[in-house]
Amino acid sequence: MKINRVLLKFRKGLLLPRQLPNIDKIILHHACMNGSIEDVHHLHLSQGWAGIGYNYYIRVDGQVYKGRPLEYIPSHCAKNNASSIGICLEGDFRKVKPTEKQIESLKELVKYLKKTFPNIKNVYNHRDLFKTLCPVVDLKKMIQ
């Protein structure tokens, strides 16, 4: 699985470490916008966060990018951050559907993460765990 890495500078004082064996779920999101991982990172920084809240970001062309390092608690789903991995897909799924390349990359990434973290038992849409429409479409169903 090819995962692209870009240099993202985080606000270190806001990053909290976590225990990787506690990761037991994956939560799926849409970005509600088009843009690069750097664009999302800068948006989250502008909101006073440590940086991008998601662990992975999938562009419309299917390219997968590493976001917040896994050893730090992400910021993507209240009350579930410490025990989850957040994956965000580029796009506003209120207006467009995810691309086939995004869905294929998402399937591959989820499979890779489940193999890497055997305690992962469930994959959720953000809306399954928090009062939101995100990711609008049923990404969980699309990757089954």
What residue ranges belong to the model's regions?
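Generic preference for flexible, low-structure residues
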Residues: 42-44, 56, 72-74, 80, ...
